[in-house]
Amino acid sequence: MQTKKINLLEKRTFSDELTVTFQFIKQEFKSLIKAFSAIVLPLIFVELFLQSFLLRDILGGAARNAFADGGSGWTTMLVNYLLAIFVFAWLQLFVLSYLRLYTDKYLQQEEIKISFLELLKVMGRNSGLFFVLGIVYLFYVVMGCVIFILPGIYISVIFIFSSCFLIIRDRKLFSAFASSADLCRGQWWNTFGYILLCSLIVSMLGYVFNLPYLGIFLEAYLTGNQPGLFELTLVNSVGTIGRYLMNIVFIVGIGVRFFSRLERKEHRTLLDKIGQIGTEERTESGEDGV
């Protein structure tokens, strides 16, 4: 059974990294969805609950007053925006912790069965530093964009693997940034293209979850009837949950590239195989001597 599992620590080409991303999602689908439902979905429900207040104001015709002269609508929108950032960060922490446990068990040749408690333990151990890293990362990117748009894009790419180093390799804050920049050295355009392609694929797949929106507003246009709060809340829930599910694909894709680039740099799997060959030869020599 173990040999059928995907080894993430392998050197792969650009196209192979994308292929393995979807193969890994397919392989771990049930386990990922169960863990996602227990660890991430409750926070998404909180976000949806807060979003329902904005929808209610819009349908009730109170949106103009709520946003006029510093009304409560701006506060509600800001809270929703900050919560969405937090939920995405929590999702990223969840997926990277899953990849950490998966690779650890694979390398140790254990049965790859990841429990909720194992995930929560890894997430809890790294959550504080992870959120600090996220704040520093956003600060770097925003400052780069303030100076000029291109520096912001450049910084966002070279530090894209910093969270991977933090969670998967137990690097400290600035060591994670330095390691990410080193891993991207000479590969900036390639990495940028990979991130862009992953984003486009995930966005295209995400449109499937937005089809209910199109249906509701098309019906409203044809009939002249305003959508009800229940209908809008329902399609908003489907779209939001679908968006986060698609983000799992994106984060796994970044993780697959991280492992591929890391293997090119460290040759860890190759060294392990050489070590296993040496162990087998010593074992055979001992048996011959007996």
Model-derived segments and spans:
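Hydrophobic alpha-helical transmembrane segments of multi-pass membrane proteins
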Residues: 78-86, 143-150, 163, 237-245
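Hydrophobic alpha-helical transmembrane segments of multi-pass integral membrane proteins
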Residues: 37-45, 87, 91
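A conserved helix-loop-strand patch within extracytoplasmic ligand-binding domains
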Residues: 69-82, 96-99, 104, 109, ...
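Interfacial aromatic "cap" segments that immediately flank transmembrane helices
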Residues: 15-42, 116-143, 157-205
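Hydrophobic alpha-helical transmembrane bundles that constitute the permease/transmembrane domains
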Residues: 44, 48, 134-135, 207, ...
